[in-house]
Amino acid sequence: TMLDIDFGSYPFVTSSNTICAGACTGLGVAPNKIGEVYGIFKAYCTRVGAGPFPTELFDKTGDQICTLGHEFGSVTGRKRRCGWIDLVALKYAIMVDGVTKLIMMKSDVLDSFETIKACVAYKVNGEEIDYFPYDISEGLEPVYVELPGWETDMTRMQSEDEFPEEFNAYLTFLEE
């Protein structure tokens, strides 16, 4: 969504529509023929190339997420920019795309972290906002909530019953 030519962080966008409605246009499918709209997101954020990225991490945590998540370009091998999840941007994407169901992926990348952060708002010129601003050229300072990590290998789990309490708390927090 953030790379969409009309709704993304212009001018750091691609030349086409990447939102759900763009799929309808590209495929010649009427919007009323779509039932559910699945929003698929990572448990953390990434960005390729230039452009605003309020939650980008420039430290060993960002490097660790990049390494554990195998966040390198498939063609160039270039390292992707990594950061904590940005719930303000996620809510914006949900609204623009008309998402009816969410699917989180790559939560196992966060398995080893003692603490996990989630951006719930931004500070712009000292004022806290909880919506995605039209002009993001000015510095957006992320406002974080810290959550306990689950420090458990999620890749070995066979059912939801095995999920650690901290992981379930993270999911509940994201759902709210």
Where are these predicted regions, by residue range?
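Non-transmembrane, aqueous-exposed alpha-helical and coiled segments at domain scale
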Residues: 1-176
